[in-house]
Amino acid sequence: MTKYEYIWLDGYEPEANLRSKVKVTDGEPPEWSFDGSSTLQAEGGSSDCILIPVEQYENPTNEGSLVMCQVQTGEHETHPSNSRAAADAVVSDEWWFGFEQEYFLTNPDGTILGWEDGTPSRPQGEYYCAVGAANVKGREISEAHLDACLDAGIELTGTNAEVALGQWEYQCLGKGIKAGDDLWVSRYLLHKVAEEFGVSVNIHPKPKTGDWNGSGMHTNFSNEAMRTSGSEEMFTSMCEKLGAVHEEGISLYGSDNDMRLTGLHETQSIDQFSYGVSERSKY
């Protein structure tokens, strides 16, 4: 018998939450159902939704496997909350993605680690990639998460303390549609590891207003042509094409980004598109 920890995204908006439950069975993980009325994915009168396994990982926090799933309706049709199915139809395995996920660690009452007595007395600046108990909070969680992801077979390529106290980042490399699966499972493991330390994870774009950096997920991308014969002309053309759909893109990148994309704190204003070489104000 094998323990399979099924993971999926619920129907909450504007951002979905991660959900999970465990199945013990022989053989490979089968399709499984759940109560969609409890996850905003179905009405109570017809609440069955179907979990379709799409990727498996070693479970570093328990025996068995982690099973990333996409959601279908009870009639085996793509659920409206399932954006993976549409992505799978167009994403190529020769597309590489490098995700840089920033986050804050918080206490059960919502206060950020290191902020228990109010705003830190020193401004941001000394906390980035820092050492020392006065400059870093939560390193043990970041390192445990890194180990968990590597044990699961997820290609994390690094981690570091970020600009604000209690803020961290990790980098996740993936190829094709599996890159998205790896990212979601890495986030799931981050939440589970944080549970063990009695803290929570906050990926809101701007947990603290004022002169403090927010959190984003910078996304690096390349296809085969970019990696083998990329030129300045090619990259400029791609950036111009991205600029032409800037508003559409912003509408898909999650809520409250207007709080982070202000033109300050290593960001560009949300209503402007720009690009440059090694230019962090373009984020």
Language model segments and positions:
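Glycine-rich, acidic/polar active-site loops that bind/position phosphate-bearing ligands
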Residues: 1-283
